[in-house]
Structure formats: structure tokens, C-alpha cells
Amino acid sequence: MFPTIRSCARGTSTPADNYMLARRRTLQVVVSSLLTEAGFESAEKAAVESLTEMLQSYLSEIGRSAKSYCEHTARTQPTLPDIVVTLIEMGFNVESLPAYAKRSQRMVITAPPVTNNPVVPKALSAGQNKQHPAHIPSHFPEFPDPHTYIKTPTYREPVCDYQVLREKAASQRRDVERALTRFMAKTGETQSLFKDDTSTFPLIAARPLSIPYLNALLPSELELQQVEETDSSEQDDQTDAENLSMHLQGDEVGMEKENSSVLQQNSMKGGEETLIDNPYLRPVKKPKLRRKK
């Protein structure tokens, strides 16, 4: 019979809540059995906790040292010689272990009950579970069912509500206006409502145009380019006409009249094509003088 432990306070956790608490309870059972063999009938909880902590630290140090010796010899799993070397390094008499194991007053601690894994009904199982590879120990939990790896992409449904669309459009318009006003306030001249702090409530300064209709009268770049092209074409036509008149001086008078009429028609067509809609930019036309008969 194990000695009764006088607890100072009730524990708030249970073995089912914490995995490490169950291992801690097993160490407490071992400490209680050692106290019973030593002749103690009862023990304080603080004393049992201290002895349990010492036993846990001792076992952890044995495992850590055995693991380091194992890895030092290029192995992955510790063996009995590794544990023996660890106990010798920690100052433990290894030769006294057989006599201590065969003592007559030792107490046998029963193994904890083994809980079997719940059997999954065949109706709920989908597919065949994946087996563990060679590098994963067998005591690790199994892989989940294959259907857990199936993923279905989700798409966000488009908003079709009229009120929501109007609110969204209004908020976007408001954001654009605010961004534009901030940009204009940073890049252009502003006026402030407060003389001390010019950065608070900046107002965009308006610049009225002195002559509002001046922009409509100024020619654009395209119109200027067209005027230059028409001037150059008229000069080319004049040079061609002079050359033709010099070469055709010895021809008949009828041919001269026909050529002059053709040139006049071409010049009339060119003049009609180069008409400008703006009345202020049209070239001046001289009135034709009628000859007196």
C-alpha cells in the first residue's frame, strides 16, 4: 500500500487534459513505492513533488547523455553500452544494479491500461490510409483519410445589389476626389484659413483667366502644321508653273491657254483644300479687278 500524500491544494488539471501530466503521475507512483520500501507511511505533497522532479531530471540526463554518445559514434538509436557509459560518467555503480533488481522487498508496479484506438466504421472510411514511411516510427499516429486532402476552390460571389454598387461607386468617387485635392494642394499654390498653421485646412487657390476666349482663338499645333504644308505646296506649284511657262514659249497659243487653264484649276482646288474653319486664320483673298472693255 502506497503512503498517503497530504495535498495542500487541489489540482486543477486531470490526466486526460495534459499528456505530460500522465507521465508525471507515473513518476509519482514510483517515488511513492520507493518511500514505502524505505519505511515511510505518509509524505507531504511538496516533498513528493521535489523527489519526482529530481527523478525526472535524473532520467532526462541519462537519456540526453546516451543520445549524445550514440550520435558521437554515428548511430541514431542508443544501445545498452551507451547507457552503461552514461551511468558510469554520472558516478553510478553499475555492478550493484543486478543485486538491486533482485531485492526481496521490491514492489511491482502494474503497467497502465492500454487504450485501444477507436475502430472507424467502414461506412465512414473513404479510400485506403497511407502507411508510414521507413523514417517515421510506428508509434506515431496514422495519416488522415484520403478525403481530407481533397480541396475545393472557393470563389467569391460577385455583388449584384444595386444599393451596394451605388455605395461602392460613391466611395470610390469620394476617394478619387480626396486624392486629387491632396495632390493639387501639394503641387500648387494654396491658401490657409489659419495664419499660424498653414498646413491645416489648405485651400486650393483659384486663378481666373484674364481673357477667357483667348484659348479659342489661338491655333493648335495641328492647324499650324497644316498651314505650313499648304504654304510649301503652293510654292512648289508656283515654281513648277514658271518652269513649264519657260519650256512652252515656242508652242502654240492654244496649248498655252490650255496649260494655263489647267494650272488655274489646280490652284483653285488646292486653295479649296486648304480652307481653314477658323475665320481668324484664313488667308486674305484679294478682290478680283474687272477689266474695262
From Swiss-Prot:
Location of this chain's protein in the cell: Nucleus; Cytoplasm
UniProt record similarity statement: Belongs to the TAF8 family.
GO MF annotations, alphabetized: protein heterodimerization activity
Protein name, UniProt field: Transcription initiation factor TFIID subunit 8
Residue span(s) of domain Histone-fold: 25-92
GO biological process, one term: cell differentiation
Source species of the chain: Xenopus tropicalis (Western clawed frog)
Annotated Gene Ontology cellular component terms: cytoplasm; transcription factor TFIID complex
Keywords: Cytoplasm, Developmental protein, Differentiation, Nucleus, Transcription, Transcription regulation
Annotated region described as Disordered, given as residue ranges: 226-293
Functional summary from the UniProt entry: The TFIID basal transcription factor complex plays a major role in the initiation of RNA polymerase II (Pol II)-dependent transcription. TFIID recognizes and binds promoters with or without a TATA box via its subunit tbp, a TATA-box-binding protein, and promotes assembly of the pre-initiation complex (PIC). The TFIID complex consists of tbp and TBP-associated factors (TAFs). Mediates both basal and activator-dependent transcription.
Motif Nuclear localization signal, residue range(s) on this chain: 280-293
A Pfam family this chain is assigned to: Bromo_TP
Amino acid composition bias (Basic residues), ranges on this chain: 283-293
Classification via PANTHER family: TRANSCRIPTION INITIATION FACTOR TFIID SUBUNIT 8 (PTHR46469:SF1)
Keyword Cytoplasm attached: yes
Biased composition regions of type Acidic residues, renumbered to the chain: 226-240
Subunit structure, interactors included: Component of the TFIID basal transcription factor complex, composed of TATA-box-binding protein tbp, and a number of TBP-associated factors (TAFs).
